[in-house]
């Protein structure tokens, strides 16, 4: 009976505590809140997808797909290499229900297989998993009303969202390289790499071929950020506080005649390399292509904001900086003043 049950002389117990959210998770929550504040909705798609999406793709090759041994169907027979197609399925689903003005974001894993890394002793050596953030923008940015007309979304709107994420996380733009990207996913796109060559992000306009395959009428603007690489890039970022300058900033404008293949990012890079201390901002405010220009040329109107934190800049200092800047743009890009 119960009278014969042994009662231990010591009582053992354990306490559990809630584990701390890691740094990456905190920043993910921060960016999620930021995107929701910008009108985005978070989506969560299946990591399983259709191998047919990757057929003939040079960017996401069939040979890098992770196949399931016993798939439920051909629509769920591989692990995704990109978040893109899941988001396009969500856009298609909404557009078919007359909801075409959309902004989505998703955090999720992408999976890759590399046969060259295959090792009999390490079964998982050939497989890789990356954590990504995807952004989708399509349809109207502003709907028609008495206060304003319709305004469509654009790739520049998407670019602003991507750069705002980088800025919020404290990424040093001096340590990254922006470049043109040409592949079968985008019709026009930009890539963002670290100085060490690691890919941080791509963003641009989805190709008409893919858009048509999903039966989507409006252009789709898409960005994919490698979250893990971004976390590495901002690891050394520090938040610095300083008082507002007591001395006025000075703006100077240049009208530059350049080759059509030259991008604003190249001008911006040369400008910051030329004057690292006093140059605060470089902005492109006008682009002209057409009559009265040489064939193969375009005109960029660029403004440069200069400011000294400790004194008022005089004309001699400003002219010296601008002369040096003009010389570097001419030598490196063949730019001419109009």
Question: For the regions a protein language model found, what residue spans apply to each?
Answer:
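Short, flexible loop/turn elements at secondary-structure junctions
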Residues: 72, 108-111, 196, 286
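A carboxyl-terminal module marker
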Residues: 3-7, 26, 45, 121, ...
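Short, structured patches in soluble enzyme cores that scaffold and shape functional sites
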Residues: 9, 70-72, 109, 137-139, ...
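Metal-dependent nuclease catalytic core centered on acidic motifs
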Residues: 102, 111-115
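Extended, well-folded interaction surfaces typified by the phenylalanyl-tRNA synthetase beta subunit core
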Residues: 1-102, 252, 305-310, 316-338
